[in-house]
A protein has these predicted regions:
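Aromatic-lined ligand-binding clefts that engage carbohydrates, nucleic acids, or primary amines
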Residues: 523-525, 529-552, 580, 642, ...
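Aromatic-lined substrate-binding rim segments of carbohydrate-active enzymes
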Residues: 64-137, 221-226
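Aromatic- and glycine-enriched glycan-recognition loops and surfaces
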Residues: 55-73, 94-115, 215-216, 530-534, ...
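Glycoside hydrolase catalytic-domain groove-lining segments
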Residues: 243-297, 314-315, 355
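Aromatic- and acidic-residue-enriched segments that line the glycan-binding/catalytic groove
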Residues: 93-102, 116, 127-157, 209-213, ...
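Carbohydrate-binding surfaces of carbohydrate-active enzymes
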Residues: 165-183, 190-199, 205, 210-224, ...
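An active-site-proximal structural segment forming one wall of the substrate-binding cleft
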Residues: 103-125, 149-194
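N-terminal carbohydrate-binding accessory modules
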Residues: 19-78, 118
Length: 735
C-alpha cells in the first residue's frame, strides 16, 4: 500500500508540473467569469455547470416557456443550443459583406427568455459545422455555389481553404454581435448571460492535418474576439486543443462527448483521460448521452432502451472521474419541422430524451431531476473535490467505484453496478490513507448507480440521488377521429412559374429547404422527332428523385433505382407542343459527408433516343489487391479471396443508415473495401447477353457513383476508364 501511494504522489507531481508548463489562461473579466483545472468560477462563486441541450429551432416559440419551466424544474442551471447558420441566413446574400438576409429574432428571444425569465446561463455553439442531424450540418445550401474548383482536403467545407474561411468569417461577423450583447460580461452583476461559445464541432472526425485545423481554430477565435466575445471559447472533441502551447489555441479548452451506451464506466475513465491531456481546464462533457436519434426505416428514439438508470449513471460516473460540467444531449430533442432534418433523419427528434418531444415527462426525467437535486446540494463542494486513492474488499468485481474528497474532508463514493442482471447487495470495506477502515453496505440494482456522501463534520452518511416524484399533470386523451369523406384533387399546376436558366440551382433563385418544387417545360416536336425520341434524361445537382408527367400521363422510370432520373416516354409524345412537368423531391441535405456540399434541384434535362428497359447488375464479387493491375486475366483466374456483395438499393440504403447512426462500421461495398486507405479493389461480375440485347443496343453500362480512378475490362479487354470523385461512369461495352 505504501509503495502504491508513493507512485501516485510522483504522478501527481508530474501532472502539476506539466500544467505549469502550459501558457497561463487569460480572461477578459476574471472577476465575472474564469476557470481553472477544477471548475468555472462565476462572480466569485465556484459552480458545477449542469446544462440541458434544448434547440430553439426544433420547437415552436409558443412552447419555449413550457420547456424552460421543466428544465428549471429538473434542477439545471444552464441551457445549451447549437446556432445553425442555414436557419438564420436562408437566402444567398449578394456578397460576403452583405448581412441583409440574416434574421436573429428567434435566437435573441430565446436567449432573453433563458436569461431574464428563467435565470439560466447559456452555452452557444455556432459551428459553422454543427452536425446535430440537421440539414447541411448547419451550412446553408447556397454556400455550395462558392465551392472552389480545387482543394486538397476531403471536404471543402470545414477546411482551411480561403474561400471557406471567407464565408466562415461572414457567418461569425453576423452572429457574434448577437452573442456579445447577451454574454455574461455585458450583464449586471447577478444577471445571467452566455458563459461560453464553441468553435467548430467534433473536429476529430474531419480528415485534415492538425496544422490546418489549428489554422482554422486561430482564425475562428479571432473572428470571435474581434466581434466583442469576452467569455471563454471552447471546442468539442478536438485533440489539437488539449495541452496546446500555441499562443491562441492554448486559450481555448476542449470538451469531451460521451456516447458510451451501457458501458457507463467509460464515462469515468474518459474524464480521467481528459484531465491528463488537458490539466489546466475543467473536465466538461459537451454531449452527455441523453438518448439517440432515429433514422428513416429504423427504430424510433422514443423506443430507446436508454432509460433513467443510463441517464443517472452517465452523470455520476463522469462526476466520479472529476467532471464539473455536464450537458445532457439531448435533454429535450424536439422536431425536425418543415424538412430541416438531415437526409435520412426522421421528422421526430425525440432522441429518447428525458423531456419528450411532446413535452411529456417520464421516469427518465425523474432520474435526471434526482441528479439535478444532488448537484444543487453538493455542486459547489464537488467543484474542487479531488480523487483519492483507496482499496476495498475483493467483492466488487462487478462494480466501478470512484472516491472524491473535499477540502473539508467530505467523501463522495460513486458506485456503478456493471452487471446487467444481478443486483449488488453486500458490505464493501474501504481503506483510505489517514482514516480507519470502514464498511459500507451497498444495494445497487443492475446497471444502476449511486453516490454515498460521508460528512467529515458530523459523521453522517446518506445515499443520493434521492427518488423523485413527478408532479401530477392533467392528461387529456385525444378524441377519436373518423374519416367520413375523402376527395381527390388533381394538381392544376397553377402557380408563380419563373423562367429558369440551364445549370441554375434552387438556392440560387431563393428556394431553400423546401420539400417539393415543380419544373415545367413545353417542347415542340416534329413527327420525325417523336419517332426518334423515347427517353427523358434529367441531371440533378444531388441524389434526389424526380416524378415526371408528359402530356398529362405519368412517365415510368427506366430503372428500379428511384434515384436514376431517366424516364421512358415512348408513346407519351406527340407532334406539336408537349408539356413536361417534373416534381422534384428534396430528400434533405446531408450533414457530414460529401453531399453536404451539393446544391439542390435539377441541373439539366434532355430528350434521348428510345431504349429498352434497364437491367440492374446487383451481384458482384470483390477483393483487394496489393499492386496496380497489370495482367487482368491472371488476376481474374485466381478464385481465392473474392467476397460476394450485393449492390442493390435496399442493401445500400440500410448500410448508409447504419453508417449515419454510427451503430457499427458496415462493410460498405465501395467505400470500406480499402478501409479509407489508398489501394486497388477489383470488382467482377458476369452478364448473360442475348442476341436481342445486342441488336437493340442494350450495351451501355452505367455506374451511379465511382470514387477516384477506375478502369473497366470486358472479357479481359480494357474498354473504358474513369478519373473523378463521386461521379457517374457510363461506358459502351458492345466492342
Amino acid at each position: 500500500m505504501n509503495k502504491l501511494i508513493t507512485l501516485i504522489l510522483v504522478c501527481c507531481f508530474a501532472f502539476n508540473l506539466y500544467a505549469e508548463q502550459l501558457p497561463a489562461k487569460q480572461f477578459s473579466h476574471p472577476e465575472r467569469i474564469r476557470y481553472d483545472q477544477h471548475c468555472f468560477t462565476i462572480e466569485g462563486r465556484d459552480i458545477f455547470i449542469l446544462s440541458a441541450a434544448f434547440h430553439y429551432f426544433r420547437v415552436p416559440q409558443e412552447l419555449w416557456r413550457d420547456r424552460f419551466r421543466k428544465i428549471k424544474e429538473a434542477g439545471f442551471n444552464t441551457v445549451e443550443t447549437y446556432v445553425p447558420w442555414n436557419w438564420h441566413e436562408r437566402t444567398m446574400p449578394r456578397n460576403v459583406k452583405d448581412y441583409s438576409q440574416c434574421d436573429f429574432d428567434d435566437l435573441k428571444a430565446w436567449l432573453k427568455m433563458a436569461h431574464e425569465e428563467f435565470g439560466l446561463y447559456t452555452i452557444v455553439r455556432p459551428g459553422p459545422f454543427i452536425c446535430a442531424e440537421w440539414a447541411g450540418g448547419g451550412y446553408p445550401r447556397w454556400v455550395a455555389k462558392f465551392c472552389p474548383a480545387k482543394y486538397d482536403t476531403s471536404f471543402w467545407l470545414r477546411s482551411n481553404h480561403p474561400e471557406h474561411m471567407k464565408w466562415t468569417k461572414h457567418w461569425y461577423d453576423a452572429v457574434c454581435p448577437v452573442f456579445a450583447e447577451e454574454q455574461l460580461t455585458r450583464k449586471k452583476s447577478g444577471e445571467k448571460g452566455i458563459i461560453m461559445v464553441q468553435l467548430e464541432n467534433e473536429y476529430i472526425y474531419f480528415g485534415m492535418e492538425s496544422e490546418k485545423k489549428e489554422e482554422v481554430l486561430r482564425d475562428m477565435a479571432a473572428y470571435c474576439t474581434n466581434n466583442g466575445i469576452e467569455v471563454p471559447l471552447f471546442t468539442c472533441v478536438t485533440p489539437e486543443v488539449r495541452g496546446s502551447k500555441d499562443a491562441v489555441i492554448s486559450q481555448l479548452f476542449d470538451m469531451d462527448n460521451q456516447y458510451v451506451w451501457w458501458n457507463i464506466q467509460e464515462a469515468k475513465s474518459r474524464i480521467e483521460d481528459l484531465k491528463r491531456q488537458q490539466p489546466n481546464a475543467p473536465a466538461f462533457v459537451c454531449e452527455l448521452q441523453g438518448g439517440w436519434f432515429s433514422t428513416v426505416g429504423g427504430g424510433l428514439s422514443e423506443d430507446s432502451y436508454l432509460d433513467g438508470r443510463h441517464a443517472r449513471g452517465m452523470a455520476l460516473m463522469a462526476m466520479a472521474g472529476g467532471s464539473t460540467g455536464l450537458n445532457y444531449y439531448m435533454f429535450f430533442g424536439g422536431t425536425n419541422l418543415a424538412g430541416w432534418g438531415a437526409r435520412r433523419m426522421t421528422t421526430s427528434y425525440d432522441y429518447g430524451a428525458a423531456l419528450k418531444e411532446s413535452g411529456g415527462v417520464s421516469e427518465k426525467f425523474a432520474a435526471v431531476k434526482g441528479v439535478g437535486d444532488f448537484v444543487n446540494r453538493f455542486g459547489t463542494q464537488l467543484a474542487r473535490s479531488e480523487a483519492i486513492e483507496f482499496t476495498t474488499s475483493d467483492n466488487i468485481k462487478d462494480l466501478t467505484v470512484g472516491v472524491r474528497r473535499t477540502k473539508e474532508g467530505t467523501l463522495f463514493i460513486f458506485i456503478f453496478n456493471k452487471d446487467k442482471k444481478k443486483a449488488f447487495r453486500d458490505n464493501v470495506q474501504f481503506h483510505i490513507k489517514g482514516m480507519p477502515a470502514f464498511n459500507v453496505y451497498c444495494s445497487v440494482e443492475p446497471l444502476d448507480s449511486k453516490v454515498l456522501v460521508l460528512s467529515q463534520a458530523n459523521g453522517q452518511c446518506e445515499w443520493y440521488p434521492k427518488e423523485q416524484t413527478l408532479p401530477e399533470r392533467p392528461v387529456n386523451m385525444p378524441m377519436p377521429i373518423r374519416i367520413a369523406q375523402a376527395e381527390r384533387c388533381d394538381e392544376t399546376f397553377q402557380g408563380n412559374w419563373r423562367p429558369l436558366r440551364k445549370g441554375v440551382s434552387l438556392p440560387e433563385i431563393g428556394v431553400n429547404d423546401c420539400r417539393y418544387s415543380m419544373y415545367r417545360s413545353v417542347v415542340k416536336l416534329s413527327k420525325k422527332e417523336v419517332e426518334e425520341y423515347g427517353t427523358l434524361v434529367c441531371e440533378m445537382f444531388t441524389a434526389d428523385p424526380l416524378y415526371v408527367q408528359v402530356n398529362g400521363k405519368i412517365a415510368k422510370r427506366a430503372s428500379t433505382d428511384e434515384l436514376d432520373n431517366t424516364f421512358v416516354i415512348d408513346g407519351l409524345l406527340h407532334e406539336g407542343n408537349n408539356e413536361i412537368v417534373s416534381i422534384y423531391e428534396n430528400r434533405g441535405q446531408a450533414h457530414g459527408y460529401r453531399p453536404m456540399e451539393e446544391l439542390s434541384g435539377m441541373k439539366s434535362a434532355g430528350l434521348g433516343k428510345k431504349q429498352s428497359a434497364i437491367l440492374p447488375i446487383e451481384k458482384w464479387e470483390v477483393k483487394k489487391v496489393e499492386n496496380n493491375v497489370k495482367d487482368i486475366k491472371s488476376l481474374l483466374s485466381n478464385n481465392e479471396g473474392w467476397e460476394t456483395i450485393m449492390l442493390d438499393q435496399s442493401t445500400i440504403a440500410n448500410l448508409a443508415t447504419l453508417q449515419i447512426a454510427g451503430l457499427e462500421k458496415p462493410e460498405w461495398p465501395a467505400a470500406w473495401v480499402l478501409q479509407g486507405k489508398e489501394g486497388t479493389a477489383i470488382y467482377r461480375t458476369s452478364i448473360d447477353m442475348t442476341r436481342q440485347m445486342l441488336t437493340e443496343g442494350q450495351t451501355m453500362i452505367e455506374f451511379a457513383c465511382v470514387d477516384d480512378a477506375g478502369t473497366l475490362f470486358v472479357n479481359g479487354k480494357e474498354v473504358a476508364s474513369h478519373d473523378a470523385w463521386d461521379k457517374p461512369f457510363v461506358a459502351n461495352i458492345s466492342a
